[in-house]
Regions:
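Hydrophobic alpha-helical connector segments
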Residues: 58, 62, 72-98, 152-156
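N-terminal positioning helix adjacent to the helix-turn-helix/winged-helix DNA-binding module
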Residues: 5, 9, 13-16, 152
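Hydrophobic/aromatic-rich alpha-helical bundle segments in the mid-to-C-terminal region
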Residues: 120-129, 142-190
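N-terminal intrinsically disordered/low-complexity leader segments
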Residues: 1-8, 191-193
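Helix-turn-helix
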Residues: 12, 16-54, 58
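Amphipathic alpha-helical segments used for helix-helix packing
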Residues: 98-118
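Amphipathic alpha-helical packing segments from all-alpha helical-bundle domains
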Residues: 65-68, 73, 83, 116-143, ...
Length: 193
């Protein structure tokens, strides 16, 4: 019975922090605000998350997991690698609109860090690497030459991330749509070779 309560408290803390980090950012969200809004004791927070940095890392993993779950659902039944890449841009656009153009959680957090934290840096790099590898795996199904596949994947990933950031800046999906058109053109020219 105790384990269920611990999971519930941990989850409640994480949900509260997720909302606050998303709405007002990491730096503007204080530990005391998280404690107050979650309605928990300070000891409970520190039992589950020894530091704000640890809480942030859990938040980043949660957001990344949610993104990949949504992406998996969005790509269900699509076998063609080119179409999977293109539909990934559509999924991101839907995600951005749904989240009021909040952007990528990893990029948002890292951009707030004048003094980069080792735990958060590692988490962001790990999560971005997972996204990059997603595009690498698809590019390798399109392009048999390993070097060309890597160049293709890196280009797509840069367009994806850059488009995401620009959507956050302009609060509009137009930049991601432009990035998607560039990727379609890139994939089309690759097909014609």
């Amino acid at each position: 019975m105790m384990e269920t309560q611990e999971i519930t408290v941990r989850e409640h803390i994480l949900l509260t922090a997720t909302r606050l980090f998303h709405d007002q950012g990491y730096n503007l969200t204080g530990i005391n605000q998280i404690i107050d809004e979650a309605g928990i004791a300070k000891a409970s927070l520190y039992y589950h998350f020894p530091s704000k940095e640890d809480l942030c890392v859990a938040y980043l993993h949660r957001k990344n997991s949610m993104w990949f779950s949504a992406l998996e659902s969005h790509l269900e039944g699509i076998e063609d690698s080119r179409q999977r890449i293109i539909k990934t841009f559509d999924c991101r656009a839907n995600h951005l609109k749904k989240n009021h153009f909040g952007g990528c959680s990893s990029i948002r957090i890292i951009s707030e860090m004048p003094q980069r934290g080792e735990k958060i840096d590692r988490a962001v790099i790990q999560l971005k690497e997972k996204q990059r590898k997603f595009f690498v795996s698809l590019a390798e199904q399109i392009e048999t030459n390993k070097k060309k596949a890597m160049i293709l994947a890196e280009t797509i990933f840069l367009l994806f991330d850059g488009g995401t950031v620009q959507c956050q800046v302009y609060r509009d999906i137009a930049p991601l749509q432009a990035a998607k058109r560039a990727v379609v053109s890139l994939l089309q020219s690759d097909l014609e070779k």
